[in-house]
Amino acid sequence: MLKITAIPALQDNYIWAIQQGQEVMIVDPAQADPVFHFLAKNKLNLTTILITHYHQDHIGGIAGLQATYPDLTIYGSHEVAQYVNHIVQAGDHLHLLNSDVEVINSAGHTAQHISFLFAQQYLFCGDALFSAGCGRVFTGDYQAQFNTLQRFKTLPESTLVFPAHEYTLTNLKFAASVLPNNNDIREAQARAETLRAQQQPTLPSTIKQELRINPFLQADNLAEFITLRQQKDQY
């Protein structure tokens, strides 16, 4: 059984720690110090880093962690080749923490953004998918991002979704503006407000929940997705 913990970093990042026994791996370390604190507090051994894409708020802690843990195994796509020692691509399967981990093409936010799906149960998706939202399409390749979302829609509804940012309340506000008759969104807003008031993460979400509240997953075609994404960019 994997234990998954959110390590807050920067303003709104989550570094996800995936633990089995005393061994732990992390996803997208924005900073090193919060990870060091987590490891010391829980007496854990860091062995592996997974990187979804090259943006600084996802790789900023790598050098500091490597300085202390020089034998780290670091996985990522070609766009982060300078930071990793194992390059992976969509369709690859890794065996980590006694689990099958599938590498999923999640392009759009960046050209070679990837996600990691553990045991068909846990999706670590970086900035490709947020609760009630998705990442900005910095590449300009809206087709790629739309295709990424279609892939996520095919995952089991019970799949837990672990994005890299706490954007849920802002995203739900936008979602409510474009889907004003969606009761699921209003209920999600109330839950998220309660959690944030208690300084708790709103994440993980599930694919089932995202299909109900995420306007980008409800876009029926590319043109509709582009319209929504451009509206959100200006929101």
From Swiss-Prot:
Pfam family, one: Lactamase_B
UniProt remark on cofactor binding: Binds 2 Zn(2+) ions per subunit.
Gene3D superfamilies with a match to the protein in the record: Ribonuclease Z/Hydroxyacylglutathione hydrolase-like (3.60.15.10)
Positions that bind Zn(2+) 2: 57-58, 127, 165
Catalytic reactions of this protein: an S-(2-hydroxyacyl)glutathione + H2O = a 2-hydroxy carboxylate + glutathione + H(+)
Record-listed E.C. numbers: 3.1.2.6
InterPro entries noted in UniProt: Clx_II_MBL, Glyoxalase_II_hydrolase, HAGH_C, Hydroxyacylglutathione_Hdrlase, Metallo-B-lactamas, RibonucZ/Hydroxyglut_hydro
Major enzyme class: hydrolase
GO biological process: methylglyoxal catabolic process to D-lactate via S-lactoyl-glutathione
Highest taxon in the source lineage: Bacteria
Family: Belongs to the metallo-beta-lactamase superfamily. Glyoxalase II family.
Residues noted as binding Zn(2+) 1 in the record, renumbered to the chain: 53, 55, 109, 127
Keyword Hydrolase included in the entry's annotation: yes
Keyword annotations: Hydrolase, Metal-binding, Zinc
Protein role: Thiolesterase that catalyzes the hydrolysis of S-D-lactoyl-glutathione to form glutathione and D-lactic acid.
Cofactor: Zn(2+)
Subunit structure: Monomer.
Gene designation: gloB
Pathway: Secondary metabolite metabolism; methylglyoxal degradation; (R)-lactate from methylglyoxal: step 2/2
CDD domains membership: hydroxyacylglutathione_hydrolase_MBL-fold
Gene Ontology molecular function, alphabetical: hydroxyacylglutathione hydrolase activity; metal ion binding
PANTHER family per record: HYDROXYACYLGLUTATHIONE HYDROLASE, HYDROXYACYLGLUTATHIONE HYDROLASE GLOB
Protein name: Hydroxyacylglutathione hydrolase
SUPFAM superfamilies: Metallo-hydrolase/oxidoreductase (SSF56281)
Phylogenetic lineage: Bacteria, Pseudomonadati, Pseudomonadota, Gammaproteobacteria, Pasteurellales
Record-linked HAMAP family: Glyoxalase_2 (MF_01374)
